[in-house]
Amino acid sequence: MTTTELVALLHLASPALPIGAYSYSQGLEAALDANLIRDADSARDWIASGLTDVLAHGELPFLAHQLARWQTHDTHALAAENAWFVASRESAELRRETEQMGWSLAQLCASLEWGDAARRATLASLSPIALPTAFAYAAAAHDAGADATLAAYAFGWVENQTSAALKAVPLGQLAGQRIIVALRGAIDAAVRRALATPPDAVNTFAPQLGILSARHETQYSRLFRS
């Protein structure tokens, strides 16, 4: 990996990326309301479970396959698999989340003119667009490899979940850093598992997350949009 590719992925994983990630907790706030999260240890366990049991089986391998589609510019597969992922979201708010963040990242890619004109036209044609599809486009535009792309995406997800826990539980900054450090190895394992997952084995089935997310839509007091 070149320094330029590394910096591009650090940019994509940064919480400063203007796609609205900070406003979503992806079920963490509902888990807190259901008393599944009570403190730093239970927050760490919840985030670890989301990484190893949900992302590693679904979102990360999907991202890897979409990266390959962008690299070969397989427009038919890109559109079909993007539509499948959007339809697979477990609740209305999780669907809105991936659509809003995907749209925001796609707009950023277009505004910064990342990628060639033909691929930018394909990107613009995908509506709604899932976040992993847009993230894969941005990574492909910077010639990033699959392993580094998935690691950046997973780290960004862990960091955002930890940030949500800091606000909602609440936790202190040191507790948040301990969670991130504790999950470094889990990120590596999730990436390796995702890279070994063929397209027909991508699995987004997450019933507990779906139920919690649906409950969150009518939760009395909320900080986050999911």
Curated annotation (Swiss-Prot):
UniProt-recorded Gene Ontology molecular function terms: nickel cation binding
The organism of origin for this protein: Burkholderia cenocepacia (strain HI2424)
Similarity remark: Belongs to the UreF family.
Biological classification of the source: Bacteria, Pseudomonadati, Pseudomonadota, Betaproteobacteria, Burkholderiales
Any Pfam family hit: UreF
Cellular component, GO annotation: cytoplasm
Protein name: Urease accessory protein UreF
Subunit structure, interactors included: UreD, UreF and UreG form a complex that acts as a GTP-hydrolysis-dependent molecular chaperone, activating the urease apoprotein by helping to assemble the nickel containing metallocenter of UreC. The UreE protein probably delivers the nickel.
UniProt subcellular location: Cytoplasm
Database matches in HAMAP family: UreF
Keywords: Chaperone, Cytoplasm, Nickel insertion
PANTHER family for this protein: UREASE ACCESSORY PROTEIN F
Summary of the function given for this chain in its UniProt record: Required for maturation of urease via the functional incorporation of the urease nickel metallocenter.
Broad class of where this protein is predominantly found: cytoplasm
Source organism, top-level taxon: Bacteria
InterPro entries: UreF, UreF_sf
